Amino acid sequence: MQVLVRDNNVDQALKALKKKMQREGIFREMKLRGHYEKPSEKKAREKAEAVRRARKLARKKLQREGLLPMKPKPAFGAERGRPGAGGPGAGGPGAGPRGPR
């Protein structure tokens, strides 16, 4: 895999490399090959992935046909983890430990 470095801008080249690797699925492959996966576990994982893909395809089809509402786009800054976004795990004033469990 090749990435051009323009004007000695290594940060931009690294960003482009990570994007290419993500698109090619290299990170996912590395994670899967990080430890041995039993054939039965591999089969179960692949089956679950196929079910997930089929559900997603069916959901998209229903949305296109107008039988399901389209997923609303989040308001600007309302993404999870952004400052001032609110919601679970967002922090903010009064955010502290959850307390005893």
UniProtKB/Swiss-Prot annotation:
GO terms for molecular function: structural constituent of ribosome. NCBIfam families: S21p. Residues 36-101 are annotated as: Disordered. The gene is rpsU. The keyword Membrane does not apply. HAMAP family: Ribosomal_bS21. One of its GO terms (biological process) is translation. It comes from the Bacteria. Residues 83-101 have a biased composition (Gly residues). This is Small ribosomal subunit protein bS21. PANTHER family: MITOCHONDRIAL 28S RIBOSOMAL PROTEIN S21 (PTHR21109), SMALL RIBOSOMAL SUBUNIT PROTEIN BS21M (PTHR21109:SF0). The keyword Ribosomal protein applies. Keywords: Ribonucleoprotein, Ribosomal protein. It comes from Rhodopseudomonas palustris (strain HaA2). One of its GO terms (cellular component) is ribosome. The lineage of its organism: Bacteria, Pseudomonadati, Pseudomonadota, Alphaproteobacteria, Hyphomicrobiales. Residues 36-52 have a biased composition (Basic and acidic residues). Residues 53-62 have a biased composition (Basic residues). Pfam families: Ribosomal_S21 (PF01165). Belongs to the bacterial ribosomal protein bS21 family.
